[in-house]
Amino acid sequence: MDVFKKGFSIAKEGVVGAVEKTKQGVTEAAEKTKEGVMYVGTKTKENVVQSVTSVAEKTKEQANAVSEAVVSSVNTVANKTVEEAENIVVTTGVVRKEDLEPPAQDQEAKEQEENEEAKSGED
């Protein structure tokens, strides 16, 4: 009987030791898993913030490009409208063409402004 008791006692100690090792291993694995999950979560959060910032910046750039195009288009339409209105009043005889011609200094300023608008439209 003593042999059995001693054998079972040794086996019991082995099982208890294995359980302790298993418990320790599971605890360590859980801690490492938690670290890994937290790391992934942190990196994902950083990447999401970076992505949102990047998208916001690109959206701002596109909005600026669109607004510049709209302003340029509106200026072109306004200039064409004025030109056509001048043509109509001259054709109908309401005003003489000479009366519509701006003084030479105003004409130079207008040409310079149109050149600047053309340059800004190219950017």
UniProtKB/Swiss-Prot annotation:
UniProt-annotated stretches for the region 4 X 11 AA tandem repeats of [EGSA]-K-T-K-[EQ]-[GQ]-V-X(4): 20-67
Region Disordered, residue ranges: 91-123
GO CC terms of this entry: axon; centrosome; cytoplasm; cytosol; Golgi apparatus; neuronal cell body; perinuclear region of cytoplasm; spindle
Stretches with biased composition (Basic and acidic residues): 107-123
Tissue specificity: Highly expressed in brain, particularly in the substantia nigra. Also expressed in the corpus callosum, heart, skeletal muscle, ovary, testis, colon and spleen. Weak expression in pancreas, kidney and lung. Expressed predominantly in the cell bodies and axons of primary sensory neurons, sympathetic neurons and motoneurons.
Entry keyword annotation includes Transferase: no
Pfam families membership: Synuclein
Keyword RNA-binding: no
Keywords: Cytoplasm, Cytoskeleton, Phosphoprotein, Repeat
Localisation: Cytoplasm, Perinuclear region; Cytoplasm, Cytoskeleton, Microtubule organizing center, Centrosome; Cytoplasm, Cytoskeleton, Spindle
Free-text disruption phenotype from the record: Simultaneous knockout of SNCA, SNCB and SNCG exhibit an age-dependent decrease in SNARE-complex assembly. Thus, synucleins are required for maintaining normal SNARE-complex assembly during aging in mice.
Residue list for modification Phosphoserine: 67, 72, 120
Sequence repeat locations: 20-30, 31-41, 42-56, 57-67
Single Gene Ontology BP annotation: adult locomotory behavior
Stated role: Plays a role in neurofilament network integrity. May be involved in modulating axonal architecture during development and in the adult. In vitro, increases the susceptibility of neurofilament-H to calcium-dependent proteases. May also function in modulating the keratin network in skin. Activates the MAPK and Elk-1 signal transduction pathway.
Assembly information from the UniProt record: May be a centrosome-associated protein. Interacts with MYOC; affects its secretion and its aggregation.
Protein name: Gamma-synuclein
Source organism of the structure: Mus musculus
